[in-house]
Amino acid sequence: VIRDVRGFAVKFYTEEGVFDLVGNNIPIFFIQDAMKFPDVIHAAKPEPNREIPQAATAHDTFWDFVVNNTETAHMVLWVLSDRGIPRSYRMMEGFGVHTFRLVNEQGKARFVKFHWKPLLGVHSLVWEEAQQLAGKDPDYHRRDLWNAIEAGYFPEYELGVQILEEEHEFAFDFDILDPTKFWPEELIPVQKIGKLTLNRNVDNFFAETEQVAFHVANVVPGIDFTNDPLLQGRLFSYLDTQLIRLGGPNFHEIPINRSVSPVVNNQRDGFHRMTINRGVTSYSVNSLQDNDPRPSTKKEGGYVHYAEKVDGRKIRERSPSFHDHFSQATFFWNSMSDIEKQHIINAFHFEVGNVESKEIRERVVEVFNQVDNQLAIAIAAGIGVDPPMIPGGTGVKGQSPAVSQMNTKHSTLSRKVAILAENGVNEDEITQVINRLKNFGVTTEIISTSLGTIKSTTGHEFKVDKTFSTGESVMYDAIYLPGGKKSVKQLSDDEKALHFIKETYTHAKTIGASNEGVDLIADAQIYGIAIASTESTASPVNSLGVITIRNASNMTSFIQSFSQAIAKHRHWKREVGISSFF
């Protein structure tokens, strides 16, 4: 749950062999040239003299790399945005990052970028949540994915492609082969071509997950590569990685990596060989076995590379079209809502605020002043350096609504609600909420002082799922506070319960409360919102995502409003100081 770019890789077992789509949850990368891979990794990892910090980029060497390699500016904004702390693997996009080629049977090629679009929409945590979850449950994302699949809430992603004719390669103000740039969906729409459903968990995590070997060069006929310099390096590096990680050259024969269609080659021996080859030959061309094995021809379904015309000198130098490091960074910044911009600024304050070198902090402001002047001023205000003295920015005015999470899908499906209750809870209220939320695809867990059961006012027993020691507000999407005088009194006297409620509100999540449960809102010191009064009719009141109702026996209208609020994910208008810099 730490802030980072996430991998998003899929292995296709096709009739023509294995195709690995090895991507990330962000459509671009830090660097343009694969030669810089070791450098960016070394800079981001713990500093070698003290092996600190672990799993964090909030330190001097990473930001020293950023200010001296400004091609990173665009990616840094994506990582410091809410995209860097996804709510769930089920709620993040996937991207192939690079530009590939699709080649038809006639040999005609088109440029393509691959996308995975989650059907649940793209949603994120807030930074404080991510920090707490890293300590409370380091396995949060893995557990969330596993539990959702076990419960039958199968994660689904639509596979989409952006396709560009080769003759339009130079039609844009960015180089389409630059891995630090993305293709705006408003210019090149994403066409949906399929759907991925994760409908079961693995049987053995080590055998099927730890041993899986993704390799960018694993493609099938019809898919080919481009001159993206980062892609060219990855074609080698993944093979090199698997040779070491999985103990030798035969990693592709491990069951999870093995092609389901027959694949024949001249590879022999080596550690962990799993195929017993017969015959005297292991080379081509040969006459002893009638040239068997041999590569398949195109007619036989063999792989044939695209016949690309090449003209020019072969040198290690990037095209001048790669030299613009800031225009798309500005474009991304323009595309963010004020809420999202504030979150990026807050992330800068945390990350760069942990940099000890004042010179590097000053240079961060200088670099991002070239992206946007107001952004640079806002960064400077929180890291103890002077704001830029000269106007900055690139002059780019455009934006892409598709990259803002404010324009994503919303759903209640597989959302998780904590119900805070003690002995004396109102049975009818809690039962109606649990049963009807289930119809919306919402799961519920009862949180109480101790494990076991609690009794309602009528003596009905409810199983307690978590206590205030094992269940935290950051593990849920919303909370519900049912009525029942005795239950509410016990919760009101419990500091952990009140903290649970207040923290849920602080993180902009939905809160629902009925009858006496409404009193807990004020007890938790949540002010500035409207709540149902004791004299009000049995109609729900919605104030900034806090749904309250009194004098109600039929909870239908309340549950409807509550579920709609849960689907919105967060209620960002609660956040204060959003207009501080805008």
Give residue ranges: language-model regions.
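Glycine-rich phosphate/pyrophosphate-binding loop and the adjoining helix
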Residues: 399-406, 475, 540-582
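Short glycine-rich, flexible loops that bind phosphorylated cofactors or substrates
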Residues: 487-489
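Catalytic beta-strand/loop cores that center a nucleophilic Ser/Cys/Thr
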Residues: 523, 527-535, 573-582
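Charged helix-capping and loop-helix junction motifs
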Residues: 463, 493-499
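Active-site-adjacent core segments of small-molecule enzymes
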Residues: 1-427, 431-439, 443, 448-469, ...
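Short gly/pro/ser/thr-enriched loop/turn and capping motifs at secondary-structure boundaries
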Residues: 451-454, 518-521, 553
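Catalytic nucleophile loop
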Residues: 357, 448, 478-484, 497-523
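Acidic, Ser/Thr-rich peripheral helices and adjacent loops at domain boundaries
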Residues: 454-471, 528-542
